[in-house]
């Protein structure tokens, strides 16, 4: 029997995949809610100790992940906004067309999508990304991050697991 997914048009999707978009929305809501709490209850760059290795520290990130390119001339805001928007559109199409039997890959894509959109909302509305989770050990500090960054990181780890360990086990013609 031919692969039913191959017969789908570009804009057709499997309705069961709406649950993965729900996971993306959950990541966005959790990210934006925690950023709002951090922005309204923390003073900028003033660490609040939580655990011996964790502070809440409100920071504004004008660059990419972990403040990469934050001191560039301002072009990075438009570049990362455009990149996140384009990748998000592609991920939505990819996500909606996943076969039903796949789980790890759509969870990975949904988390990356939710994280990218969470940070995109900040870039568009604020001109920077709100970071507030500050992890450290003694004098070794990891760059501040947020829930969106965590979703992207977890999604990327799951994507790598799927690519290197699970993809080989999938049947070639996975029907929806």
Swiss-Prot record:
Residues of the active site: 131, 149
Listed EC numbers: 3.4.23.36
Gene Ontology MF, one: aspartic-type endopeptidase activity
Pfam hit, one: Peptidase_A8
Pathway: Protein modification; lipoprotein biosynthesis (signal peptide cleavage)
Catalytic activity: Release of signal peptides from bacterial membrane prolipoproteins. Hydrolyzes -Xaa-Yaa-Zaa-|-(S,diacylglyceryl)Cys-, in which Xaa is hydrophobic (preferably Leu), and Yaa (Ala or Ser) and Zaa (Gly or Ala) have small, neutral side chains
Entry keywords, A to Z: Aspartyl protease, Cell inner membrane, Cell membrane, Hydrolase, Membrane, Protease, Transmembrane, Transmembrane helix
Disulfide bonds: none
Family to which the UniProt record says this protein belongs: Belongs to the peptidase A8 family.
Designated name of the protein: Lipoprotein signal peptidase
Organism: Acinetobacter baumannii (strain ATCC 17978 / DSM 105126 / CIP 53.77 / LMG 1025 / NCDC KC755 / 5377)
Gene: lspA
